[in-house]
């Protein structure tokens, strides 16, 4: 999204060597942030939170979302990127400065309006040989009504279209 791109640009302009992002919806436990920073310090270029690997916790995840992530989104990005992802839809991530400034990735383009950048980076970074890692995290949905910006058939179809475009190189620079 434009907000993500602005945040990345600001952090890079300030000289930061890496960026950690976390969704502002209070579903992710920020206790994992120091592990994300440590992974960047150890040379990892892309750290992705995962509630589905050993040590991760998925609490009250809506069944339809759980199914879509485990059996559509993550497997498809894994197949096309060459890296085994398990949890590709959330924004709890960390990126190295080197990766974000790579002109072959070029994340500062106007084509990234909604969720495109999240899917694209999961596809493109491993394809270019960047060191990627998933770390276990906790993601808790509240009981009852699920707060989300993705709703209805139209919203889910949009996410699926973004996924296909990312996997088939639509957002790639070359």
Model-identified regions with their sequence ranges:
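Acceptor/aglycone-binding surface of glycosyltransferases and processive sugar-polymer synthases
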Residues: 1-13, 30-111, 142-160
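Short beta-strand-to-loop acidic/aromatic patch adjacent to the donor-nucleotide binding site
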Residues: 16-27
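Residue-level detector of anion-binding/catalytic polar loops
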Residues: 17, 45, 131
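Short glycine/serine/threonine-enriched helix-capping/active-site loop
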Residues: 22, 47-50, 135-137
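Conserved beta-strand edge residues that scaffold enzyme active sites
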Residues: 25, 53, 138-140
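Catalytic donor-sugar/metal-binding loop of nucleotide-sugar-dependent glycosyltransferases
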Residues: 109-110, 122-139
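Acidic donor-binding loop at a coil-to-helix junction in glycosyltransferase catalytic cores
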Residues: 112-120
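C-terminal, non-catalytic tails of nucleotide-sugar-dependent glycosyltransferases
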Residues: 159-174
